[in-house]
């Protein structure tokens, strides 16, 4: 199977995907209602799409192609309201968060589609453990070589995206000590991590052909990389974020990525090198484990900062691009998160500390999603 052609798209357009938790409303455990929700909303007109995910306790929403922060917020709120109305009709709840706080993975039911059943056979229990919930952001690229440049230069900022979105401190009733425990589940898959270091589309096509020849992959969907090209959309897809607890935060993070992309492609401040990845896994771990207080090492200078400090300095650098895109309000929210060092994981721990109940924490997650 050959790699599909890269469709050139309008630079810096973006789309947002959010994987959502579906919970019951008596003890707020996950429940099997994905197919029922899809049946209920199949005739609704929304500015995007709603699709099944690998288990019946999940659903994915996606916006259309957005150009501004204002549009992304409006699209996400409209889709959210449609889903919440349908969920209320079924007497189930919806919430964000990268993991469910106390669900047992063995109770999950794989959705009955050929691809999901194939993944279940291939990966065994990992498929059910993959009931985790992420935000993906697509960024439009003018050509395939620009997409690969953006992919590798954007990798420098992966710790920012993880720490800002982190919302998965609890797994199976236990505080993991991580801000984003979700990514530990993703990292278990053999084709996860970072993309190979190639900077031309010809080289990427050659790599893809070799992987297909080995029988390891059939399509780009088989790669679970932190950032991957999506040739059929003409985008790169940033995949490291936990699903935030609110659509407004999801939109702000998406626009931070959009603004960074404009800075990287127009200003070309980074010359990507293979050695940039020497600290990649360390920086990624620090963001997952410690959130905004984690350490971030600049791969080119070796300078160490906290992730929150690095975000604030980055916001200063990209301010002209925020003005050009109209994303000032989004980046103001990102700055407030970085200065306070309070992400959704910190908020969730605060709820559990006050209420002494993971069930109550999930109930409040549902309220945050509706707000």
Swiss-Prot record:
Keyword Nucleotide-binding among UniProt keywords: yes
GO biological processes: modified amino acid biosynthetic process
EC number(s) given by UniProt: 6.3.2.2
Annotated keywords: ATP-binding, Ligase, Nucleotide-binding
The keyword Plastid belongs to this UniProt entry's keyword annotation: no
InterPro entries: GCL_type2/YbdK_subfam (IPR050141), GCS2 (IPR006336), Gln_synth/guanido_kin_cat_dom (IPR014746), YbdK (IPR011793)
Catalytic activity: L-cysteine + L-glutamate + ATP = gamma-L-glutamyl-L-cysteine + ADP + phosphate + H(+)
GO molecular function, one term: glutamate-cysteine ligase activity
Xref: Pfam families: GCS2
Enzyme class: ligase
Role: ATP-dependent carboxylate-amine ligase which exhibits weak glutamate--cysteine ligase activity.
NCBIfam families with a match to the protein in the record: gshA_cyan_rel (TIGR02050), PRK13516.1 (NF010040)
Similarity section: Belongs to the glutamate--cysteine ligase type 2 family. YbdK subfamily.
Protein's name in the database: Putative glutamate--cysteine ligase 2
Source species of the chain: Paraburkholderia xenovorans (strain LB400)
